[in-house]
Amino acid sequence: MTTNSKSLNLLQSLTCGICQNLFKDPNTLIPCGHAFCLDCLTTNASIKNCIQCKVEYTTYIPNHPLKQMIDCLDQSSNNNNSNNNSNGENTNNNNNIINNERSSFNGSNSNSIIGFIEGLSDSTSNGRRFSQQDGLRYSSGLLDGSNSGGSNNIRYCMEHYEHYYAFCNDCQAPVCPSCLLTTHNRHGMIPLTKDSIATKMKEYRDIVQSFKTKMSQYKDNITLYQKEIELLDSTFLQCKQSIQLMISNLHKVLKSRETYLLKEISSIHYASHMELTDRSSTLENEISEMEKLIGNGTDKFKDATEILNNQNLKFEFLEQFHHSRTQSKKNQNQDGLKPLFKTDLLFYKANNERVTEMINGTLGNISLLTFPLDDIGEVNIWDEPKENICIEKVRTNSNGIEEFEVKYGSLNKLIERLCLPNCYDDNYVNIFLLTYHSFCSSKKLLKKLIERFTIPEDLEAHGLTLASIHEIHMKIRSVLVKWINEYSPKFDQDTIHLFQNFNCRMQSEYTSIQEIENLLLNSNENSPSITSSQSLSSQSLYSQTNNNNNNNNNNSNNLQPTIQTNQTLSSNINNITISNLNNSNLTNNGTCKIQNSPPKNYQQSNYSSIFNGPSSSSSSSPSSPILSLNSLALINGNDNLVFESPLNSPRNNNNNNNNNSPRSSSFGASSALKFNSNNNSLNINSNMGGPYFPSPSSPTTNNIPNINHFSSRILSSSKNLEFNDIDEFEIAKQLTLIEFENFGRIKPIDLLTCVDLKHKTPHITNIMERFHNISTWVSTTIVRGENLKNRVKIVNKFIKIAEHLKNLNNFNSLTAILVAIQRSTVTKKDLVKQSVKIITDLEKLMSSDDSYSTYRTRLAQCSPPCVPYISIYLQDIMDLEKKNPSNIIVQTSSNKTQEFINFTRRSLISKVILDLASYQRFGYSTILPISNIQEYLNVHIDEL
């Protein structure tokens, strides 16, 4: 078998790989060395790669030794053929051919390769010679010789007319030697012996038997499927009949329904036609009546000439009226009450028929001087039922005063509570003005306040007295002043016009409101956003009013009474006028004292609110809106100015009695605060005797470090600064100043309108993008380290910066840096022990476990200034809005329900907003801003 394989390999090496025949003019390819026939290479000249090794060849040369070998083989083959023909061996059977093949394959080493090929050539030629004789036998499938011999049970190849030599296991077919050298080259072969043939026959029988078994199964399945098809056909017929029946029934039903609906439509059409006919007749009657009224009105307009001729009478009335007003002002200390404009008109109307006739003809009926609402069918605020508001008692404070809380109510009742006589809840006013955007527009709120300002004719039906009317008017004025000064909403032009009209009316009855005039002035200057100017205190309003009174009456300066008030405005409210109210100030014992001159330590910024941030003392510079918690304490007359309300954050619940706490400081205490324009923070007035809050401590030093050791680099351009050149504490301080400036711009309306994180305002978007940019800046700076050692050094520096931020109470930037460090490639194993301890403590501090309980505890204990983590407040507001619906449906009767505004939801949300706003009151006044470092931080952070 070994000799056979070698001989076949040798024969294959003498065969061309293209034509699969012995070489004819063999040529060798350069450089691979494979040989092919010259004709084959010429025919396939377009192929530049070798057929066998696929290597590109450059040229080919004749292979003379191989050509000589082929010639020798051909010559030997011709000699053998001639010898076979001469000896008459045409009658040899197939056994001689097989024996020759086996002798050639299994011959000894003495046989030469040429002799083997010659013998194979002889057997091949003999095979071709016998093919003509055995063609019929081969085609009929008969065997040559006896069936007992292994070599006798062989057939012939139909292609080459040679005896089968072996069985190709890959192709599953018998092959002859020529097939073995050509198409079945290098395939797995099985010799054709009796045992192998028997084994294959057994395998084929098993396969045939399995096929027969499967065929029987398929026949059985076909029978079953035919039965199923017959069953499905019968079922299909039944379903078809049932569907046809249902369709016919449905058609009948629809036909009857169509007939019924057509009858109904015709009846409705007839009824509507009759109704429209009746309405048209009614409208025609009304039109005729209106034409009559128009004719009567034309007659009345003709009488206007008579009114114009009575100018002397009008001037006489106005002179009398002015004289009465002047006399009333002189006698206000004796009467105890300032006469009202409407009261004077009613007096003259009742006592002078001619004047009454003139007023009715020119000004119209006084009772009709009400504000026309745009909402048709809306209930007037004076006609709203009393039960449309729910108020519950919350607690009794230390002074024995009962405190109430509004749960829900209608819009009219909620606005009415803003200016109830003998009752003023400063907490309620703050909550309402803080959250009214969620259920009411600014224009509608102003309309309702004007509607409340307009007193109805029937005073007794509403339980009103002159004192209560005056108190309602004063509280409406105070609410408007507080609304414009402290909350500074953006008003549209319609609302601005309403303010202007109301201020003109207010000027005719009392005095104009300076805040509204400033608002109108800003709107006339075409400012981009209609906001209030720098807030004026009630003392500035006093100065305006007092100057006007001095011009009209020189004797009014000597008539300034002093009034002592209690916890609420009761009997002494009759003695308070708009002029002395604006001059009021709180004494040390908690009483309200009216004085002629403004307080000595008065500052215009005292009445700013904490949402406005620090403001300049110049009235020309606009300020962002802030919220003051006790700005109406002067009007309320409360002897305790410390803000104690349910709106206080939980951290103040245990320290309500501690008046020295910076978070519970009174409104008056903030008068020592002054705006520092350099760093947008609050400086402490020297009159306070020292700083109001201690400076934030640092892990390196408790004082502000001297930066002279790197001042030469800092004072240079920020482009020359490098991260490693700047001190960690200085980076933390300048970053805190920038963050506090962005934090101070947040307004209450921003927190009310962006909690869904889809429609964020620019201020919220800015601070959230800043948080992301800081985190990205830290990650980028760490990655820029050339190797692990440099990256570890950068991480250690950022850890120190984070610790300084913690001591500066800048928790927002601290969280951004922690997020970047946690996702960096530098692990705690690479850091020094001190840095590992610091980063572990910081991670525990800002951990989100138990809803940031550790952070909330630290925040409650820290002293301002502070930059809290903003995302927590946004999440708290979102949770409150999900748990508390905007409106509440209450069953007012057995079969009637009514929807009210859920004011509890607004109170809870205002807690969060006021808690956040409390940190905007106090800035980092002790930190020196360095422009180059801030520019470096802004450039490297914002560019990301």
UniProtKB/Swiss-Prot annotation:
Q: Where is the composition biased (Polar residues)?
A: 590-604
Gene Ontology terms for molecular function: guanyl-nucleotide exchange factor activity; zinc ion binding
Q: Which UniProt keywords apply?
A: Coiled coil, Guanine-nucleotide releasing factor, Metal-binding, Zinc, Zinc-finger
**Source organism, top-level taxon:** Eukaryota
Q: Region labeled Disordered — which residues?
A: 80-102, 530-562, 587-623, 644-670
Q: List all Low complexity biased stretches.
A: 605-623, 648-670
The record's annotation in PROSITE patterns points to: RASGEF_CAT (PS50009), RASGEF_NTER (PS50212), ZF_BBOX (PS50119), ZF_RING_1 (PS00518), ZF_RING_2 (PS50089)
**What Pfam families does the annotation carry?**
RasGEF (PF00617), RasGEF_N (PF00618), zf-B_box (PF00643), zf-RING_UBOX (PF13445)
Q: Which CDD domains match?
A: Bbox2_GefO-like, RasGEF, REM
Where do the zinc-finger regions (RING-type) map? 16-54
- Zn finger residue spans: B box-type: 152-192
The chain positions of domain Ras-GEF read: 727-944
Its GO CC terms are: plasma membrane
Q: Where is the N-terminal Ras-GEF domain?
A: 402-528
Residues annotated to bind Zn(2+):
157, 160, 179, 184
Gene Ontology BP terms: Ras protein signal transduction
Q: Which residues form a coiled coil?
A: 200-234, 271-303
Task: Say what the protein does.
Answer: Promotes the exchange of Ras-bound GDP by GTP.
Q: Please state what the protein is called.
A: Ras guanine nucleotide exchange factor O
